[in-house]
């Protein structure tokens, strides 16, 4: 019995040490900002820096679907969800049901400025002083 406890303790201890020695996962996913080559850099170095900087900016600003922290947003009935009230006229999916547009889309029947005033209360179910 004591041998089993020792083995379990050693397994737990080795697992903890292995986890502590790993680099943090966030550091592996974040790209490093390219280093400026200086004012006396050759055109090739500046072109390489510009390409690396463009790649860096694209990595930082790319859309991350499902990866955002949604503390301040709703997980349901967001503006532009299939449950919002703006149908796409004439466009139907395979099941024959209407597709829906994002709030304020250029193809929607209501101008964008109307959505900036009314989209959030409608999505929250609080339109006209409701719930």
Curated annotation (Swiss-Prot):
The lineage of its organism: Eukaryota, Metazoa, Chordata, Craniata, Vertebrata. This is Pancreatic polypeptide prohormone. Residues 1-29 form the signal peptide. SMART domains: PAH (SM00309). One of its GO terms (cellular component) is extracellular space. The keyword Signal applies. It comes from Bos taurus (Bovine). Belongs to the NPY family. It holds the Pfam family Hormone_3. It is found in: Secreted. The keyword Zinc-finger does not apply. Keywords: Amidation, Cleavage on pair of basic residues, Hormone, Secreted, Signal. GO terms for biological process: feeding behavior; neuropeptide signaling pathway. One of its GO terms (molecular function) is neuropeptide hormone activity. CDD domains: PAH. The modification Tyrosine amide is found at residue 65.
């Amino acid at each position: 019995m004591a041998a089993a406890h020792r083995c379990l303790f050693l397994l737990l201890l080795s697992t903890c040490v292995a986890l502590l020695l790993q680099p943090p996962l966030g550091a592996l996913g974040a790209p490093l900002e390219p280093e400026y080559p200086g004012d006396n850099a050759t055109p090739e170095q500046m072109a390489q820096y510009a390409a690396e900087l463009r790649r860096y900016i694209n990595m930082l600003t790319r859309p991350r679907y499902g990866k955002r922290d949604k503390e301040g947003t709703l997980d349901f009935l967001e503006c532009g969800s299939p449950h919002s009230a703006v149908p796409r006229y004439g466009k139907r999916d395979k099941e024959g049901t209407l597709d829906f547009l994002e709030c304020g889309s250029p193809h929607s029947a209501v101008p964008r400025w109307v959505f900036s005033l009314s989209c959030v209360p409608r999505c929250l179910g609080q339109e006209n002083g409701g719930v």
